[in-house]
From Swiss-Prot:
Domain of life: Bacteria
Reactions performed catalytically: 2 a quinone + NADH + H(+) = 2 a 1,4-benzosemiquinone + NAD(+); N,N-dimethyl-1,4-phenylenediamine + anthranilate + 2 NAD(+) = 2-(4-dimethylaminophenyl)diazenylbenzoate + 2 NADH + 2 H(+)
EC class (word): oxidoreductase
Protein purpose: Quinone reductase that provides resistance to thiol-specific stress caused by electrophilic quinones. Also exhibits azoreductase activity. Catalyzes the reductive cleavage of the azo bond in aromatic azo compounds to the corresponding amines.
EC id: 1.6.5.-, 1.7.1.17
Keywords: Flavoprotein, FMN, NAD, Oxidoreductase
Protein name: FMN-dependent NADH:quinone oxidoreductase
Amino acid sequence: MKKVLVLLSSPVAKENSYSTYFATKFVEEYQKINQEDEIKIIDLNSFDVSQKTLTSGNFATFFNENDSDALINELKSVDKLIVASPMINFNVPATLKNYLDHICVANKTFSYKYKAKGASIGLLDHLKVQIITSQGAPSGWYSFSSHTKYLEGLFNFLGIEIAPSIEITGTKVDPKPKEELYLEFEQEIIKKASEF
């Protein structure tokens, strides 16, 4: 039995969110194949820690036992991670960024020790992540920004194995109901869920 943690981050209402909808469908397909796995879903919009932003005023206390350590210990206790994120102003939502700020802690999730100068080692190398992203613009429209690449790079930095990402793009340029759009991605979702 594997333990799976799912992070939903869209500030869009659940019934209107593409990233949440596609992540939910992915989890449903995954559960069909892995019925014994334990799945925990966290909506970061209603998660206290993800409301806390790192500032100069709280830097000394931000990475604390009740917040950072608890989240890191949870990540160390699970086998797989599913992260759903829309693009908000060319980046991930603030709630997800706040969560990531809490877990990126030197000598806990990454380290510069025991590596060549200028290199690092990720300490979450037991984990595998499935990234599911959505954005209003088609892929490649904005070369200066890719929230998918940002997440892939960050999780790679932490030593996490990255499954091929699922990118739902162009949702505002060629608007379709999410249920209709899902039909275009259904086989990809089923395939990637079976391989995850």
